[in-house]
Amino acid sequence: MNHWLAFLNKPESLKEQNSDCDQQGEMRHVTDGTLTKSPESKPFRERRSQTWIDSEVPTSTEKSNVQESISSDIISKLSNRRSRRNRSESWAGSEASSPSGNISTLENATEKNTLKSPNKFLQRGGLPTVGIGSQALSPAGKPSTLGNVSPGKFTTYKVHNSIEVNRFSSTPTKLLTNPHKVAAISNDEHYVVSNESLEENIEVAHLENVFRSSKTPDEEQSEYMKLGEIRLSSSSYGGSISKENSLPKVLDELQSQNEEIKALRQKLEEKDDRIQELEELNSMNDAKLQRIEDLQKEFHNERKAASKRLNIVQDRFRKEIKKIREEKITDFQNKNASKKEKNEVTSAKTKCKAFSQRNILVSELYRKQKQILNLQQENDKFLKDINESNNSIVKLRSEVEILKSNLQLSQDENKKLHDNGSFYEKRLNDVYSYMQNLSLFEKDLGKFILEEMKCGHSPSMFQNGFAKLYPDFQDIKNLENMEQYKQLKGKIELLEKNDRIRLEKIISVFKLINERLHFMQQQHSHKIKYLQKEALTKEQQFRLEKRRWHDILNLKEENFQKLKSELKEKLILSEKIQKNAEDKLNDYMNEHQEIVEKLQNQALIASRWSTQIQESENTHKKITDELAGKQSEILKLEETILSLKEDVFQEKLNLKKLYGDPSTELNFETVGKSFPHITKEKYDSLGLDILTDLTYVQSQNLIKNLLIVLDIPLKTFLKIVPTIVIQLRCELTLLTKFANDLNLKVFGKQLDFKSRRKVAMNEFLNNHDIAEVKHPLEYDLQALFKYFFS
């Protein structure tokens, strides 16, 4: 029964297993490229069983975990939004703090702004130390060469008319400026915008120090009065600029929204990875995931378009604000200062701007250097990991070679045993042919001896049986032949004894050899299968590891090359900026006279810019409306994610129902309780572990085939199986033995059950109907029946 069932089910099961293995390999290839690692080197069925085991958690705990994860995500989003709003408000507050009163307020404002600025370096006199003085340090820790101000410029103080003045010991020399250079829009743009009030404070302080070093004590009083008026006007102007500088808040909110969108995209990708593992169980999830991916692509494209629009609007706003600010400053200077004061103010302004721009460039260069160092460290780590992986690959190869050598040895041993068995079979065939051809006095003595051995008669009965078959030998009784007869009889008895002993030995040895060969063949076949599986799994592991490390190295090299090229571009830009600033300093002095004549025309242009600002505000409102629509889309996506989570949870419950209770699963321990006579060797020989590798459909097909062939309903199957086993193991053996012995007594030969069973098996395979099978044994039994009752 087992033979023909295996014959029926083997091709389909092998095909399905091969297809499953191919799908598993494809799944591994897809998932291990996240490089996640792979996940693992385990087969898919083991990972599937692990997911089943993980899904055995009670439903209440899973629901609570899902609710807790959702609530924690919402809380983290709210906290991130609040922290970003507080940060933007703090920056706006620092921008609104304009200089008024005395220099102490300037120092406090600079301390607040420098604490929050991206240039986290040491400070001297409330100003960043980068580029100030010969002893100032660069971000890399080396002496700065960006300016040649003496060390004592920010050390002496003087109180005059209750105004604390940070007095310079000497005037600064040429500073590199580039006022028309527009900084590239980046994530740190709000730092630059927020430090505009700081630049105004630095300008005023620098003007005071210059006037105190260049004017006489009599002229200082009038100059201080003028500077006081300048401060009051600049404080009012700073308040108006702080209102205009509300754009960084919008930028911060947009950046926070972009970060939230990125976080949502990352979460969606994680959910996609989880859902991909359940693709084999539910095909409906594939369609839902495809919809989500399409929505993500559309949302990503729209977000890119919105970010481009925002960048364009930001550029316009920054340019317009800078132009309006320059126009108002020039108008104010024309009304309240002379031409010399204007020149000094503009030069101080350009120097301060150049100073701030150079600080920003230096900070960016320092940040890029840190990124390059980090990338180099990561590259070293990856090289170490690659060396370790190469060592592991070498070990795996050596293990594969050892396994191959063991497999070859086992195959050689199997061949030797097969050759020995064939040799003994030849010897037995030779002895059998010799006994069949043995004749004495033209009588078949050898055939008679073989039949007596088959019947199991004792040697003492040989003479009687021989005399019955050959009565002619009884007349030989003369004296001359009696002696020869006795001698021949003694020799024949000795030969018979020797032949019997030899035959018994040969038969016993042949049985032992057959049993040993069968046992060794089973062992070697199991070993060969196990070694082949191990070799395949290790080769797959090696290929996956090799692909994963190759992809990681390519990504890291690409990132390293990109950062390297960006650094080179930044260095080239910084050198160009320095050269252009030195050239433009001389050009600005010549162009100043022409700018004074053009100021009157700029007043008319200011009205035009105001209208353009209104238009830009309208566009900004449109963009905010678009962002609100995007937020509604994000909420819809979150709802779809929650529905997908519920679907995944329901699929896990369905999987749990399909898998059943693992505590009721049969293994060697549970089988030993109900069948104590079964040993571990017997349990392993039955091959029950193969059933764990079968799919749900394969296991159903196996049970259905059994029920159809046996023609037993499922309700009574477990009750009837013991009776079938008793019929096969006990009753069938007794009946076959009885029929065989009866046929031997009647016809002098045994029944050949194997050949008749093969004929019946071929008929069943052709028809697949047990009722139409005509067993050849029926004819033999009818012959026996006729012999006794006819």
Swiss-Prot record:
Compositional bias, Polar residues, is annotated for 50-78, 89-108
UniProt PTM comment = Phosphorylated.
Q: Could you tell me what this protein is called?
A: Accumulates dyads protein 3
Alphabetically list the UniProt keywords.
Answer: Cell cycle, Cell division, Coiled coil, Cytoplasm, Cytoskeleton, Meiosis, Membrane, Phosphoprotein, Sporulation
Per the record, GO CC terms? chromatin; condensed chromosome; condensin complex; peroxisome; prospore membrane; prospore membrane leading edge; spindle pole body
Give the protein's biological function: Involved in the pathway that organizes the prospore membrane (PSM) during sporulation. Mediates the assembly of the DON1 ring structure at the leading edge of PSM during meiosis II. May constitute a physical link between SSP1-containing PSM precursors and the spindle pole body (SPB) and may facilitate the recruitment of other factors that are required to promote spore wall formation.
Please give the subunit comment from the record.
Interacts directly with SSP1. Probable component of a SPB complex composed of ADY3, SSP1, DON1, MPC54, SPO21/MPC70, NUD1 and CNM67.
Query: Which Gene Ontology BP annotations are present?
Result: ascospore wall assembly; ascospore-type prospore membrane formation; cell division; mitochondrion inheritance; mitotic chromosome condensation; sporulation resulting in formation of a cellular spore
Q: Where is this region: Disordered?
A: 8-122
Query: What positions belong to coiled-coil segments?
Result: 241-328, 361-430, 477-498, 540-658
Where in the cell?
Prospore membrane; Cytoplasm, Cytoskeleton, Microtubule organizing center, Spindle pole body
Give residue spans, biased composition: Basic and acidic residues: 39-49
Q: Which organism is it from?
A: Saccharomyces cerevisiae (strain ATCC 204508 / S288c)
Which InterPro entries is this protein grouped with? Sid4-like
- The reply on keyword S-adenosyl-L-methionine is no
Q: Does Cell cycle appear among the keywords? A: yes
Give GO MF terms, alphabetically: chromatin binding
Tell me what gene encodes this: ADY3
Matching Pfam families: SID
